[in-house]
Amino acid sequence: MVFNSVVFLFCFLPLSLLLYYLVPGRAKNAVLLAESLIFYCWTGVAFLPLIAVLIVFNYLWALLTARAKAKLRGLLPLAAVLVNLGVLVYFKYANFLIDTVNQVAHLGLAALNIGTVLPLGISYYIFKIISYEVDVCTGKIAPEKNFITFAVYVLFFPQLIVGPIVKYREMADQLHDSANRCTPARAEHGAELFVFGLAKKVILADSIGALWTDIIGAGGVGLTNVSTPLAWLGIIAYSLQLYFDFAGYSEMSNGLAALLGFDCPANFNLPYISGSITEFWRRWHITLSGWFRDYIYIPLGGNRKGQARQLLNMFLVWAATGIWHGASWNFIAWGLYYFVLLTIEKTFLLKYLKKGKVWPHIYTLFFVVLGWGIFTANQPGAPLGLLLQKLFVPQGGISPVYYLRNYGVLLVLGCVCSSALPHWLWEKISKNTVAKLLVFALLTALCVCYVVAATNATALYANF
């Protein structure tokens, strides 16, 4: 069940909010846990025992860690991290590793019978759990003694599908203040966030994404007959689709959290206006970047042990970033691609980028869009080699004119909406209450029309 589906918007959401608001404060966490369990099990209960065991194990393990003697204080969380990572590796990467070993060593190992469907949200809730265990070990937080409260943190349904990856310490105060966390101001902000995110997802992402789908499906032969201009048009469309899909879903997540009384960190901050790759990654998937910084980069020494060690740490972080996104070599290549770009910037380029005005933005957009070409290279019909050939070796083929005629306005709208202009306009509109309510109502109605007319409700980043 995704947030842009009819069943969520017209059944689950209103009923869950109504019940949540009606119960007294002391019962809100229990109700929220029940609602999160229903949400998690909506498409099946096959993986419910898995997440239940993980919640119980990590709840008890953190309590044990806090009481352990100093000699064991570092070993216990390490064991917890290995257990949780082991679960993630088994479900997400085991068959990829087996296939890789078979190709390299020709061993003929049999693939594991674990299916192709990942447990819902496993990449996100495993990282939340690991951050909790590490923070308990380092004394940044005390272990949660209330089992229901801890279970709500792990299962919190607004964050189950695509995050954001919120640390326990960022939610703890509100988890414990169930009587006062729901306020009219927070609910109003949550409704705005949710509708704006829904608009990005169903009006922009899904509509622009149809262009990329049409291009790689042209003639049933993928990119084979696509011209160079059309290949660039397609990868630009995919870049916009991915941004609006993920940023929109993240906004919906934070909007739902605010409706439930929680303030969660933003996951995006206009990444396509960045003037460097370094700045881009401060604006894109902020909570994932922060997680790798806090739990891998800094513990390894960060930039405190010389440039060579810093580059090694960066290599490990970006290899892990690529691997986190999926069990495929194109994701690993994508992560290392950014390692190379960031290394170049840190070594000498960043100081020149800071002096420029226009060219740093062009440079950043070019390499980010090219990066999305690597990212999407496992899609049928768009192998990386063929895509790069189409992009950089001028070729004739299917003209972009037809696609520009059908999608040109959408592409322009997408470019405008990925800038700071919509935020500025909303600030101006918000000064007039009547205008604000009217625009909000119209946008909500338009989103509802798109949702009802849609034939397939998905979220791209739910696959990671």
Where are these regions (language model features)?
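Membrane-embedded transmembrane alpha-helical bundles that form the catalytic cores
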Residues: M1-N463
